[in-house]
Amino acid sequence: MMIKVKKETMRACLSCSICDNILRDATTISECLHTFCRKCIYEKITEDEIETCPVCNIDLGSTPLEKLRPDHNLQDLRAKIFALKRRKVKAPGIVSLPGKRKERSISSLVVSTPMVSAQAGTTRRRTKAPTRKELRNGSLAERTVKKEESSGDELLESTSSPDTLNKFTQNKRQSKKSCKESISNKENKDGDEPWDSKMDWKPLNFLVEVANGTKPLKSSASQGSGSKSEHANVSRNQFQGSKTKTKNKKRKCKREDDKSNNGDPTTSETVTPKRMRTTQRKRSATTLGDSRNLPQPDESSAKQERRNGPVWFSLVASNDQEGGTSLPQIPANFLRIRDGNTTVSFIQKYLMRKLDLESENEIEIKCMGEAVIPTLTLYNLVDLWLQKSSNHQRFAALVGSSAKDFTMVLVYARKLPECNM
């Protein structure tokens, strides 16, 4: 639905309150939503140093420029209603290029050119490059010649009379002749040696021969640097000597081992060190099969296991108890004590509680028919039981079978009163 609205009413809505013109780059304050031209509001804030809105004086904080936002909707509406007037620029007319002029060379402009420079360039002979010594000695003469040439060129530019040109060419020729004579005299003094003979071609020839593979590297190194090769040979000989020494030592050790294995202990003991002797003793003990040495580690290991592990034993009431009433058999006759360092008096206290006795001194414990001291530890008691058992025999047992035949048996009975004489 189309509605006709006057431009004046729209102009009032789309105009800036600072410059009273139609908005250009509409910019709105986010706090109060008043819209201005971007240029106008920026200049107002920065130049007048205000921190409030120019219309409603609302506070914009310490950074008012951050509260400004571009309003694209108003800008699009302004572009549709009040289109920007574009200036019509007249197209530039066709500029006619000037006619081409004939270019003249620089040589045609010069009236007279001196012929001395051309003659000097053509009459110079090509000579071989001089050595460093010649360059050092002839540097002063060349500098003087260059100075004269530069001064001569300046004179040529300034003067063009034939008399001055002739004088200059004569002076220049004389200076060149003197310079050549001095260089030739120095060459004669050096001994008329050719330039090629003075050059040292040895390193280049050596590189060519090495690249072609015709000459070995060792011979050239020995000829070129004698001191370095001698030093390298000495170090190689020392390294080879140390290698041979270590090899000889290894061979000697192997021979001594072979002799000791064959049965010559006297010779090996006199020559071999202490470490070799200990290893030979161990080998001889294992090879000969000495029965006395073999069970020793087993016994020590078994003893160590007994010292660390618990102690199993069985308590049995004595059948032939003299005197008063005999002690009954306790129900749990197989017992285990974790700490083997406990004394026999601990077993006496256990029996006193089980049998309801008044004192532990009423009980006497025997092992293998002999009375046991109450202060004796269980580990020592096990050692005594093993010593008195039958000939240290080994018995085969299956895993899970009864250990009744392998446990220590302790017999308890009522202690007889001591008779006072």
Curated annotation (Swiss-Prot):
The keyword Nucleus applies. PANTHER family: E3 UBIQUITIN PROTEIN LIGASE DRIP1. This is E3 ubiquitin protein ligase DRIP1. Expressed in roots, leaves and flowers. Disruption phenotype: No visible phenotype. Drip1 and drip2 double mutant shows delayed growth and development, but increased tolerance to drought stress, compared to wild-type. The keyword Metal-binding applies. Residues 106-121, 157-172, 262-271, 285-294 have a biased composition (Polar residues). E3 ubiquitin-protein ligase that acts as a negative regulator of the response to water stress. Mediates ubiquitination and subsequent proteasomal degradation of the drought-induced transcriptional activator DREB2A. Functionally redundant with DRIP2. Keywords: Metal-binding, Nucleus, Transferase, Ubl conjugation, Ubl conjugation pathway, Zinc, Zinc-finger. Residues 178-198 have a biased composition (Basic and acidic residues). Interacts with DREB2A. InterPro entries: DRIP-like_RAWUL (IPR044768), DRIP1-like (IPR044807), Znf_RING (IPR001841), Znf_RING/FYVE/PHD (IPR013083), Znf_RING_CS (IPR017907). It comes from the Eukaryota. Autoubiquitinated. The lineage of its organism: Eukaryota, Viridiplantae, Streptophyta, Embryophyta, Tracheophyta. Residues 218-227 have a biased composition (Low complexity). The gene is DRIP1. Residues 244-253, 274-284 have a biased composition (Basic residues). It is found in: Nucleus. GO terms for cellular component: nucleus. Residues 106-198, 216-307 are annotated as: Disordered. A zinc finger (RING-type) spans 16-57. Signal peptide: none annotated. It catalyses: S-ubiquitinyl-[E2 ubiquitin-conjugating enzyme]-L-cysteine + [acceptor protein]-L-lysine = [E2 ubiquitin-conjugating enzyme]-L-cysteine + N(6)-ubiquitinyl-[acceptor protein]-L-lysine. Gene3D superfamilies: Phosphatidylinositol 3-kinase Catalytic Subunit, Chain A, domain 1, Zinc/RING finger domain, C3HC4 (zinc finger). One of its GO terms (biological process) is response to water deprivation. Pathway: Protein modification; protein ubiquitination.
